[in-house]
Amino acid sequence: MEYTYQYSWIIPFISLPIPILIGVGLLLFPTATKNLRRLWSFPSILLLSIVMIFAVYLSIDQINTSYIYQYVWSWTINNDFSLELGYFIDPLTCIMAILITTVGIMVLIYSDNYMSHDQGYLRFFAYMSLFNTSMLGLVTSSNLIQIYIFWELVGMCSYLLIGFWFTRPTAANACQKAFVTNRVGDFGLLLGILGLYWTTGSFEFRDLFQIFNNLIDNNEVNFLFLTLCAVLLFAGAVAKSAQFPLHVWLPDAMEGPTPISALIHAATMVAAGIFLVARLLPLFIAIPYIMNLIALIGIITVLFGATLALAQKDIKRSLAYSTMSQLGYMMLALGMGSYQAALFHLITHAYSKALLFLGSGSIIHSMESVVGYSPDKSQNMVLMGGLTKHVPITKNAFLLGTLSLCGVPPLACFWSKDEILNDSWLYSPIFAIIACSTAGLTAFYMFRIYLLTFDGHLNLYCKNYSGKTNNSLYSISLWGKEGSKIIKKNFPFFSLLTMNNKERSSFWMKKTTYPFNSNVTKKMRPFVSSPHFSTKNTFYYPYESENTMLFPMFVLSLFTLFVGVIGSPFTQFNQEAIDLNILDKWLTPSINLLHESSKDSENWYEFVKNATFSVTIAFFGIFIASFFYKPTYSSLQNLNFRNSFVKSFTKNFFFEKIINIIYNWSYNRGYIDTFYRISLIGGIRILAELTYFFDRRIIDGITNAVGILNFFVAESIKYVGGGRISSYILLYLVYLVIFILVIYFVFF
């Protein structure tokens, strides 16, 4: 087995030939490479599958033996400094490697069809393979220098993929925003690494932790300086994992292709920050203030992300804020010292969120057949609805991911989120109340997404009926330019919806006002098939995606169903003590500051109590979302109750004002972007204008003033002479005599 560990260094580099070969092929044989572009997906998937098999093999050995392996090559630069490069294989490395490869394979299979008509197909697969290579290099790194190198490569790949359609201004701006925001965190990370090396003299994790603890125990170092270094290290994770207040890049990152959104949110970019904190947790534990800061940032992000997701119209942005909130749960767990719960939620959330993003990609793909390539419309949930009958397989997969993220048993996220909620009660009741309340908000906004997308009828052709703004429908190319294909929308659907047969014949002859009929379902079919409508408009409807897009969703659905078993509290299956808690054995020895000496009976009691409470909150959130967003005509039996509630609710202006405040808060992203735009961007522009004024008016003014002064002096002097040489000689002699006399009387 040790022979296998010796060759583990190859794990990050197995997928590296793909971007190299694509680049060489486009450089030397561009025509042939482009003609055979669909063949490049197979080696990409094959090589990543080899990495997955390798990682699974190592993980099985980790579970059975808890063996930790580190190999280091030392490069001595001089007598005082040597650079060590190597790889580190432990349970955290294996967990992340399996997560990256399994999600990455599903995304690559999905992307083969999703990106098949895109001009940048080859570029996309080159970026994706480089992305997987960078992330695998990050998780196998044995020291902080390697971490930082691969950290920057992960960031670079994410910027390239966020701005993949770089000719679209929104995509280019999103790429710049992600770059600038992460520069803040990455600069802090670099300073923290240098500060730790200056203090401990080592970059290696094992040596670093031991030296760090010895310095603190013996009071041989400035504790304030160590705290500052730890804060700077944590700043890198805050930016990369979209934690408050450096979260602003994450929603805009949805401008990239949907498959890369799934990979970024599940297993790569945002997971890198959680991995860094988990890797450095022994260091952070030695500084209690940092642990409290991590927990505080986590709980703020949990609540902040959930509230911002409440009123989003874009399906991908809604899921992005959901990711932000769930990452906050992981950071909260790490801050509480619940290492296993954080990694467990990282695993379950990765598969659930990958399923949701691939499902949203299937929805967007189907909507593009109706509205064309227009992200403002194909991703707008207001224009969706009624997709259940058009994309039933996608609907079932999306529902499974939604229920999992809501925390409904026995799906994956229920087990991990409930463990975090249980630990939060032991850490701080205030944090626990916020975390549990946010669990209800999560159920609310996730079912809001589901109901707006799949329930009711397609709102695209019902905009007059549903009160939506009547926007012109146009298509734009894959490169962001408006096309000339216009879908005419002159058909007054609301009026036609409520006509009887006699009124239809005179529809074009006179203008009539018609009463509203709430039973829309009966009126929908004639609108599509009745021969009485003499209109030139052709209405298209979404359709289910192809099998190559549905297969990854099916596999991720299986993960969402069963992956929660590896960390469930069912430690014994029967009298023979079959242990199902694989994660507990996998992460041995595990860090848990809240359960150092707890018994199974106490754990069971806490689990049942908190599980009942959290599931109740989740179902309450689902009920509220169903009450407000489930179409009236699909639940007519509750119509009288709902009408009476709405009437009594609208009379209370206080509640109406609160709802408006919450909506504005969510729709305007918590005003954080506005604050940054005014304070940072506006402040920098004011500083630039002041600098420009100082440079042009003061610096250039002084220089120009000297030149102008010389000009006027020269103009004045030129009129002193009369143009006669004898006068000049006489004047020169007079000045010379005066000069000699002055020198004589002064020095002699």
Curated annotation (Swiss-Prot):
Effect listed in the UniProt record for changing T170S: In strain: cv. Borszczagowski
Keyword vocabulary terms for this entry: Chloroplast, Membrane, NAD, NADP, Plastid, Plastoquinone, Quinone, Thylakoid, Translocase, Transmembrane, Transmembrane helix, Transport
One Pfam assignment: Proton_antipo_N
Effect caused by changing T513I: In strain: cv. Borszczagowski
Signal as UniProt keyword: no
Major site of localization recorded for this protein: plastid
MF term (GO), any: NADH dehydrogenase (ubiquinone) activity
Single GO BP term: ATP synthesis coupled electron transport
Thylakoid listed as a keyword: yes
Transmembrane regions: 9-29, 40-60, 89-109, 125-145, 147-167, 185-205, 219-239, 258-278, 280-300, 327-347, 354-374, 396-416, 425-445, 550-570, 611-631, 728-748
GO cellular component entries: chloroplast thylakoid membrane
Topological type in the membrane: Multi-pass membrane protein
Superkingdom to which the source organism belongs: Eukaryota
Subcellular location(s) of the protein: Plastid, Chloroplast thylakoid membrane
Enzymatic reactions: a plastoquinone + NADH + (n+1) H(+)(in) = a plastoquinol + NAD(+) + n H(+)(out); a plastoquinone + NADPH + (n+1) H(+)(in) = a plastoquinol + NADP(+) + n H(+)(out)
InterPro entries: NADH_UbQ_OxRdtase_chlpt_su5_C, NADHpl_OxRdtase_5_subgr, ND/Mrp_TM, NU5C-like, Proton_antipo_N
E.C. code: 7.1.1.-
Subunit structure: NDH is composed of at least 16 different subunits, 5 of which are encoded in the nucleus.
Membership in a protein family: Belongs to the complex I subunit 5 family.
Described purpose of this protein according to its UniProt entry: NDH shuttles electrons from NAD(P)H:plastoquinone, via FMN and iron-sulfur (Fe-S) centers, to quinones in the photosynthetic chain and possibly in a chloroplast respiratory chain. The immediate electron acceptor for the enzyme in this species is believed to be plastoquinone. Couples the redox reaction to proton translocation, and thus conserves the redox energy in a proton gradient.
Name under which the protein is recorded: NAD(P)H-quinone oxidoreductase subunit 5, chloroplastic
Native source species: Cucumis sativus
